[in-house]
Regions:
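Catalytic alpha/beta core of large soluble enzyme barrels
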Residues: 214, 363-365, 405, 409-410, ...
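Long, structured ligand/cofactor-binding scaffold of large enzymes
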Residues: 76-219
Length: 775
């Protein structure tokens, strides 16, 4: 892509008189903070006497959980802990963010009147306060705290086939990692290891340079940052070194297994794991329509030299190459696949440059050297008591949040001048949602069903249609994005593709007729207005993993994911934890027509047994409603793929989602999944087969700190327990527990062990895993 000159923050190009903002959630003269009940709490993370974080006397809305209290106080309250400048109230945090964004909007002429600006600030404050939506983490970290804050979590870089460019790539990544964000890059311009250099000899090849970049990322990760360096490395399927790329991480897994067997510490921070290469990046192969057709038709595939652009080496059977991709993923969960033709078919700005790569989690895909700031809506906040979707509230929340994201673009800072220029020239935004799985379950709709997919498609279509309608309205007031003029025809064509896709959602698959009607109407309005005014933003929506911000919003499920399990841990105010049945289970039972007594019996059964199978009075036909990601009734991988296929046509970007497969899955199963995703129109897919990673960070701090004698005692106790006939011991209703944070391949989560009165472990829970680099 041509390098875009640095644009000035002022003046903005304006074609109107600013935007009007209507009141919906708030009342003039009443501050949103007065609409909730507040209470003082202590925020604490740790177990026993070992405390990793504690802040006493923090102020939170009474409706926010203790889980949210702990995470928000630790992650998002700004200022030195223990100092007078340290934030201690959600009022300070939300006021800092909403107030700063509103002031930026005032300064840059976004609002028609002062009253509109005040209304915007009040409505945004209400939305954030009531956990209806949340920005990505860098906004909470930096807005209102730094003069020119870094607000984006997603970056895409580029590299040329020169040593200068390769070294510059490493420098740019380092700057991004230092800020706690992630980046992606396509290395396909770098010549292959079998190609010649101008001054003689052969090239190192991209995989060799990946080794150095991975070490650099690992070093920065261990330099005191709380977020791991997050990377995506992409290579085109016709690159001469594609097979070396496919196998590079799988071969390192063999090394990891050997080190583990030799007694080395292979936990995520262990010295053994630190010597394993390529572990700081997700790898993806870029495949074209032509390659996938060659696989389907059992044709040969030719690799192409980077220097001459001519065939290099002998042709390879396309199916063999696909099998190698699947086998490597079977062994180590890498590489994933990105479907290049599909991605660029939906590209709004192809005349400015093609889409070559993505951010680390694969949801943001746009031109090289660009950025995206994210926000997510909490779908459960738009569920009415009767289960219908509150279209009016959702539309208004989209309007306010999308405008806030747009305002953020210009005053933000960026890691390089070129990224800043492109961010302001294209103004890419990434609105998404969380709690889809909880919403469907609460409505008695199975995740893996036509009704589940139809509902999700309608919600996604409404979100993106409404976002682009807002983008067109902002373009009327502020002007379209700088590169819109050269992309007018393709951008408008993609908008019509989105609109047409909304009419392909079967009416029978969405029981909420008002929701589907609103989705189609939003696209009609967005297309009609946008073709007259243009659009302010080249991209509007993605589906991010929503990691940490899902805790801020008290979500039961993250991103597009189904519920992880039916039983979870609840943090208690004042300390301690207790196991509870997901709050969506009683809602689902109520929706399905069960009475209070039956609901109480089913909930008690689930709490005791950890499964709903066999619960009293529960009809077999209702079991699919309670299918979750893992366990006895786990959703099949095709159920996950079909959900992605149903929602993908309504997103500017893509979907961050790792499709889990059981340990028994075969290489052929994985290859078939890659083919199925292509046929479904999905833009990217990553697969994780249970047990495929040797180095997994499930070793607890307590184990690490235990002396050898204690380790021996533990192993002896485990051996004795295994030798005995199993006997059930009922867990106490309230019990002590230990929670440990872990990371697998850059994806972080929490494992919690609940204990009996004597301190022995009686149950283990794994929370939803969030991914770094996006939220």
């Amino acid at each position: 892509m041509d390098q875009i000159p640095q644009t000035q923050l002022e003046p903005e190009v304006r074609t109107g008189e600013g935007l009007s903002v209507r009141r919906f959630f708030t009342t003039p003269g009443e501050h949103p903070f007065d609409s909730v009940e507040w209470e003082m709490r202590d925020a604490r993370i740790g177990h026993g006497d070992k405390v990793s974080f504690e802040q006493q006397g923090v102020e939170f809305p009474k409706s926010w959980s203790q889980n949210a209290t702990n995470i928000v106080a630790q992650k998002y309250f700004r200022g030195q802990l223990g100092s007078p400048t340290r934030e201690h109230s959600v009022q300070q945090m939300i006021g800092r963010v909403a107030g700063t964004i509103a002031d930026w909007g005032r300064d840059r002429g976004y609002f028609a009147t002062d009253d509109d600006a005040d209304t915007f600030e009040a409505e945004l404050t209400h939305i954030l306060l009531h956990q209806m939506a949340a920005f990505n983490s860098p906004v909470w970290f930096n807005v209102g705290f730094e003069e020119s804050p870094q607000c984006s979590a997603c970056f895409i870089l580029s590299v040329e086939d020169t040593m200068e460019s390769i070294l510059e790539w490493n420098t740019k990544e380092g700057m991004i990692f230092r800020g706690g964000s992630g980046s992606g890059i396509n290395l396909s311009k770098i010549r292959g290891s079998m190609e010649s250099l101008a001054k003689g000899g052969t090239a190192s090849g991209p995989v060799s340079f990946m080794r150095g970049a991975d070490a650099w990322a690992g070093t920065i990760k261990s330099g005191g940052k709380t977020r791991r360096a997050a990377k995506m490395v992409v290579l085109d399927v016709d690159h001469p070194d594609i097979r070396e790329f496919i196998w590079c991480k799988a071969k390192e897994e063999d090394k990891a297994a050997a080190l583990r067997d030799a007694g080395f510490d292979m936990s995520i921070d262990g010295e053994g794991f630190f010597s394993i290469q390529y572990q700081n990046a997700n790898n993806s192969v870029r495949v074209t329509e032509r390659f996938m057709q060659a696989v389907e038709n059992d044709e040969e595939w030719q690799l192409i030299g980077r220097v001459t652009g001519t065939p290099i080496g002998d042709p390879i059977p396309a199916r063999q190459l696909m099998r190698e991709i699947a086998e490597a993923a079977w062994r180590c969960a890498d590489p994933g696949i990105q479907y290049d033709t599909t991605i660029n078919q939906w590209h709004t700005s192809p005349n400015s440059g093609r889409i070559n790569a993505s951010n680390p989690c694969s949801e943001y895909m746009h031109v090289d050297n660009s950025a995206c700031n994210l926000a997510s809506l909490n779908l459960m906040k738009f569920r009415r008591p009767d289960g219908t979707f509150d279209v009016a509230s959702f539309e208004h929340a989209v309007d306010v949040m999308f405008l806030a994201q747009e305002i953020i673009v210009s005053p933000s800072s960026y890691p390089t001048e070129q990224i800043g220029a492109n961010a302001r020239a294209f103004r890419q935004l990434g609105m998404g949602y969380a709690n889809l799985g909880a919403y469907l379950m609460a409505n008695g709709v199975p995740y893996d069903s036509d009704a589940g997919r139809g509902t999700a498609a309608a919600i996604t279509a409404l979100m993106t249609g409404r976002a682009y309608l807002g983008s067109a309205r902002t373009a009327a007031a502020m002007g379209p994005y700088d590169r819109y003029a050269e992309n007018r025809d393709p951008h408008n064509a993609v908008m019509r593709m989105h609109r047409d896709a909304s009419y392909a959602i079967p009416d029978s698959a969405c029981s909420d007729a008002d929701l589907l009607s609103a989705a189609r109407r939003s696209w009609e309005e967005a297309v009609e207005l946008g073709e007259r005014t243009g659009y302010r933003n080249a991209q509007a929506t993605v589906l991010a993993p929503t990691g940490t911000i899902s805790f801020l919003m008290d979500c039961d499920t993250t991103g597009i994911e189904p519920d992880f399990s039916l039983v979870k841990f609840k943090e208690l105010v004042g300390g301690g934890q207790m196991t509870i049945v997901n709050r969506t289970v009683p809602l689902a039972l109520q929706t399905l027509g069960y009475n209070d007594e039956q609901i109480e019996q089913v909930v008690a059964y689930v709490n005791e047994h950890g499964t709903i199978v066999g619960a009293p009075d529960l009809a077999d036909e209702h079991l699919p409603v309670f299918d979750v990601a893992v366990g006895e009734r786990a959703i099949s991988h095709m159920g996950h793929l079909k959900m992605m296929g149903a929602t993908q046509p309504f997103l500017s970007g893509a979907i961050s989602k790792t499709v889990n497969m059981p340990e028994s899955a075969t290489v052929e199963d994985i290859a078939d999944a890659y083919l199925a995703a292509w046929r479904l129109g999905i833009k990217a897919l990553a697969i994780y087969r249970d047990g495929s990673k040797t180095a997994q960070a499930l070793r607890t701090d307590a184990q690490k700190d235990a002396p050898a004698s204690k380790e021996a005692e533990i192993q002896k106790a485990v051996a004795e327990a295994l030798a005995k006939t199993p006997q059930r011991r009922r867990m106490p209703r309230e019990r002590r527990s230990i929670t440990h944070k872990f990371s697998i391949g850059g994806h972080e989560g929490y494992i919690t062990a609940g204990m009996y009165e004597d301190g022995t472990v009686g149950e283990i829970f794994l929370t939803d895993i969030g991914k770094e680099g996006s939220t």
